[in-house]
Design a protein with these regions (language model features):
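Glycine/serine-rich phosphate-binding loop and adjoining beta1-alpha1 elements at the start
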Residues: 1-77, 81-82
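Rossmann-like adenosine-cofactor binding region
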Residues: 124-179
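Fold-independent oxyanion-binding glycine-rich loops
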Residues: 15, 91, 115-116, 149-151, ...
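Short, charged/polar "capping" segments at the starts of alpha-helices
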Residues: 117-122
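Short intrinsically disordered, low-complexity coil segments enriched in acidic
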Residues: 1-5, 95, 131, 164-165
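Glycine-rich adenosine-cofactor-binding loop
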Residues: 46, 62-67, 71-103, 107-115
Length: 179
């Protein structure tokens, strides 16, 4: 648990999001009294070890979350990312965090596709078109950046779908990021 909470064993080395989630969950559980003495001791040790790993090493020096890393990639590739059409595949917390970060950076041409049409509830100021997977192939033709954050056994976007979209787009490049 200490390895995960400290960011040593996470998707992005040094990621701080997991540590924050761990602390929040632990404190909520402790506040409502569902954590026993042993788990309190264990959780406090995890927090102590995680803080020590961050302060005594460079692990958290330039750490980003998975969504932050995706946004950094978008900014590195596109000169004007706010002019690009973005398609977010998925509607879970990671997808919602990606959408929130995109909006914070002025990128607001965002559409969201999910297995079932699910309203993404972030903030009333975010206007996001939501659609089902059936509309995915049509949306690809108008999309410059695809950020997928859906857990699935099989690929949601296949080679043929990308080739068809590129043909329709007259080979205008697309960035596909799978989180």
């Amino acid at each position: 648990m200490s390895k995960v909470a400290s960011g040593i064993d996470s998707q992005v080395l040094g990621e701080q999001e997991i540590f924050g989630q761990f602390k929040t969950a632990y404190r909520k559980a402790k506040d409502i009294g569902i954590v026993g003495r042993e788990l309190i001791y264990f959780s406090e040790k995890v927090i102590e070890i995680s803080k020590k790993a961050r302060t005594q090493t460079n692990i958290g020096l330039n750490s980003l979350s998975v969504s932050g890393l995706a946004l950094k990639l978008v900014n590195n590739i596109f000169e004007n990312p706010q002019d690009q059409n973005v398609l977010v595949v998925g509607a879970g917390s990671l997808a919602q965090n990606v959408i929130k970060r995109l909006y914070e950076k002025g990128i607001d041409k965002i559409k969201s596709i999910n297995r079932s049409i699910k309203k993404i509830k972030l903030n009333d100021s975010y206007e996001i078109f939501s659609g089902s997977l059936e509309s995915l192939h049509n949306e690809l033709e108008h999309t410059d950046i695809v950020i997928a954050s859906s857990t699935t056994e099989l690929p949601i976007i296949g080679k043929g779908a990308v080739e068809n979209a590129l043909r329709t787009r007259k080979n205008k490049p697309m960035l596909l990021i799978d989180l």
